[in-house]
Amino acid sequence: MASASGSPVRVRFCPSPTGNPHVGLVRTALFNWAFARHHQGTLVFRIEDTDAARDSEESYDQLLDSMRWLGFDWDEGPEVGGPHAPYRQSQRMDIYQDVAQKLLDAGHAYRCYCSQEELDTRREAARAAGKPSGYDGHCRELTDAQVEEYTSQGREPIVRFRMPDEAITFTDLVRGEITYLPENVPDYGIVRANGAPLYTLVNPVDDALMEITHVLRGEDLLSSTPRQIALYKALIELGVAKEIPAFGHLPYVMGEGNKKLSKRDPQSSLNLYRERGFLPEGLLNYLSLLGWSLSADQDIFTIEEMVAAFDVSDVQPNPARFDLKKCEAINGDHIRLLEVKDFTERCRPWLKAPVAPWAPEDFDEAKWQAIAPHAQTRLKVLSEITDNVDFLFLPEPVFDEASWTKAMKEGSDALLTTAREKLDAADWTSPEALKEAVLAAGEAHGLKLGKAQAPVRVAVTGRTVGLPLFESLEVLGKEKALARIDAALARLAA
């Protein structure tokens, strides 16, 4: 795909460094990245850091770190450079001021001296009369005398862009043809009274100067598109822009209660998913399904498969609901796709202090390597590894009291005694032999394997649910396992 003029694809990802990155931001970055890579185009990473009150260097560093962790690369931007540097808006103020002045000089913009109180009064009157409540164009055609009077009153004007008195129609890459009537798109501010340029100016100016061909962004910015198209036409006339980019607006991501997922929702924080041990490839797989799909019958795929198939015209316009359980399930599938060696290494952060509850010297690498393939079949997120293998490295199992109560019913002492005898005589190099031993103990007490192994599992691991029992027994070792059964029998007898 190329732009309307046939130039190569150039897309941008332009977050603000405010707070922790959130999953909606990641979904937008993913779709732009995949679109650029699918078309062998260029991804521009631009930082919109013009809000001094909210932006921070810490958030900026988190953004870069998050992009790296997710595996995104960019062709122009921070740490990479490029022909349109600088790529931080805070370093481009002279550019915006120059463009604003050109718009004023050409009559595409004008100074507005209305106070907030005056704006509010006229807005309420318009609402009461059933008319559009946007800016009414009061300062559009001020005389020199009016300007002089306002200036003498000490009023500091903002700069507004002059919207054309005509409908604006464009074809959204996701939603199809959309038309905005002029009465619904009033003149809007582009420069504050203190001279600071607003997002409404800097974002399209940067897109124009960086020759962006396709703008893929959230649905919340759809209503700003007619204003930007009108501004683009003015920028083309001034020689600042070459063409109007194509726009595609991605569907809302909905959270619990069918409400739009906000960056303030804990569920939306990217850091939360990193801390829980989501794989980048698992999280990205799930986020890609929020508005897009590879095929009707395939939910699990690699990032390479997504790039090969991604077409923004396949993105659905309807809101997509974030389903945490499905996200976890897909991540679990990606955990099972890892090579075992890769899995063992990715689990490392959860196998050492301060996360791991065992002493560093009690961690046994050989036991970890032996149990890892079995653990890999069970996890949804990597952080679950700690509770699944703690029985191997702690001196005693940590008993979950609910599990103890559930498993240690009347007759459990007799079953455990028989199971201990059978296990003591079994071959501990064979999980199948250990299974036969517990099966035989169960048969001696009229129990099937599922009922027979529950007390053994709790005695050895502390829980009723966990990794495959007989492989766990083999890795733990005969001496420790039998000692734990003895301890459980003593507790039952107390």
UniProtKB/Swiss-Prot annotation:
Keywords: Aminoacyl-tRNA synthetase, ATP-binding, Cytoplasm, Ligase, Metal-binding, Nucleotide-binding, Protein biosynthesis, Zinc. A motif ('KMSKS' region) lies at residues 260-264. It is an enzyme of class 6 (ligase). GO terms for biological process: glutamyl-tRNA aminoacylation. Its main location: cytoplasm. Binds 1 zinc ion per subunit. It catalyses: tRNA(Glu) + L-glutamate + ATP = L-glutamyl-tRNA(Glu) + AMP + diphosphate. Catalyzes the attachment of glutamate to tRNA(Glu) in a two-step reaction: glutamate is first activated by ATP to form Glu-AMP and then transferred to the acceptor end of tRNA(Glu). This is Glutamate--tRNA ligase. It comes from Streptomyces coelicolor (strain ATCC BAA-471 / A3(2) / M145).
